[in-house]
């Protein structure tokens, strides 16, 4: 079974992997083809049947003239990560400790960026933003070096800690990351698409959505 997936560049790589892994466990052999790009370009590819599914952090944009259906996979809060040295300086009294702390944030195309900045405003916190990144993996690499505190979906917090040698300095459910599968089908029939959507809702995001 050929499974062609477009991944919006703002979706964390680890999230994309966990969402797609169930498709590789199907009884029928699956050959997966992953393409990463801006959401608009991926939707254009899907419109001419070059992709079976697009993973995104937002539903189908209303201003794009492409036939597509958004299927919400789930949502979760965010966690803040820092090296042990940085966490020792800014890890106490969360979230007040983020005041003037060096912060790495997602680029302006990521939906969570706006939610995060609004939350800072509501908390009357002004971190010192030292970097903005469209690529979440690059943001984590900078964070691993101790340049600043960064965020990631809480659902992958343990994995981020292990992989990058960082600590969780705080977390909130007031800022959420949301993930969607966009397809041309309202009624899902492609076995890979069905596997991805079912596993996300029943396993990966089940606890987060029921918090």
Task: List each language-model region with its residue ranges.
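Hydrophobic hinge/microswitch elements
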Residues: 38-42, 47-50, 57, 109-167
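A late-sequence structural motif
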Residues: 15, 89, 167-211
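Beta-alpha-beta core module
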Residues: 63-76, 137-188
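Secondary-structure junction motif
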Residues: 57, 88-90, 101-123, 189-197, ...
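Flexible hinge/capping segments at coil-to-helix
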Residues: 68-107
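Central regulatory/effector-binding core of bacterial HTH transcription factors
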Residues: 1-62
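Short, surface-exposed acidic/glycine-rich loop or hinge patches that mediate macromolecular interfaces
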Residues: 10, 37, 110, 186-187
